[in-house]
Amino acid sequence: MRRISLEDLHIFRCVAVEGGVLRAADRLNRVPSNVTTRIKQFESRLGTQLFRRQGRNVVLTDAGHRLLGHAERLLRLADEAEEDLCSGVVAGSLRLGSLESAASVRLPPILSRYHAAHPRTHVELQTGTTAALLRRLDNHQIDAAFVSEPFDKGSLSAVAVFAEELVLITARGGPRIGGAQDLADQTVVAFPHGCSYRRLLVDWFAAAGVTPRRFLDLGSYHAIVACVAAGTGVAIMPASVLDNAVMGDSIQRHELPEAMRTNRTNLVWAGEPGGPLSALLELLRVGA
């Protein structure tokens, strides 16, 4: 007799995501006592504690964290199996990760077409750096991600979908930049570690023997552009982002060396793509 059922995993995942029994019960349309009983019975069958109390909430134990990855994968496979039997209609959920640049500029028209073509598919989009998105993909928190090169492909499947022109930006009115050596002792304004564009800029500096004075880590392109415009430092970003940025006209653009001027964004995923992801891949192929 199996100790784990899909219903067990569904209830467990809901409690883990919501961080408490009351919120999970509301989402599951169950009474809280029923959810509590199901979790206790599940823990008893497994012989291990999955949650522990933290104030008014519950948090996962080490065993719970391990189970969550399996639960995400098994529930997704169950959804995919159900989708495959729905007369070819693409339905279910598609959890995407994306760089902020792609999410704000490249993806809106694509997601709009996808939404119109597949109304029974629920799309979730979250943003992050390339490294952060690859970790979420490895932890089964997302189904696919739009990431920038360079990245460690490993066993992932990948397809190049966008080509971005990268530019160096400085405050308006500053001197002409002829190379990385002209930026000695400058502050680099960038996303935190894990950003591929930051890595490209740092590698360019290192090749020229230049050491940035310091780094200012920010969480959005709007903040980066504003700080550069105020004279804080220099940054690297896609020209398409600047074209749509609120303060895009308040900075000075500089061409980068040809070898690093163009950067590709890839859609990456693990394993065989399910129905919703296959539909997105087809849409990207047709629209290429």
Residues covered by each model-derived region:
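A short LG(V/I)-centered, amphipathic sequence patch enriched
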Residues: Q41-L60
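Central regulatory/effector-binding core of bacterial HTH transcription factors
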Residues: A91-G154
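A late-sequence structural motif
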Residues: R106, Q252-A288
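Short helix-boundary/capping micro-motifs
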Residues: R13-V31
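Alpha-helical linker/hinge and terminal dimerization helices associated
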Residues: R45-L46, L67-G88
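Secondary-structure junction motif
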Residues: T187-A208, G274-L281
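Flexible hinge/capping segments at coil-to-helix
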Residues: K153-H193
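Interdomain hinge and pocket-entrance segments immediately C-terminal to HTH DNA-binding domains
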Residues: R56, D62, L85-A103, A117-T121, ...
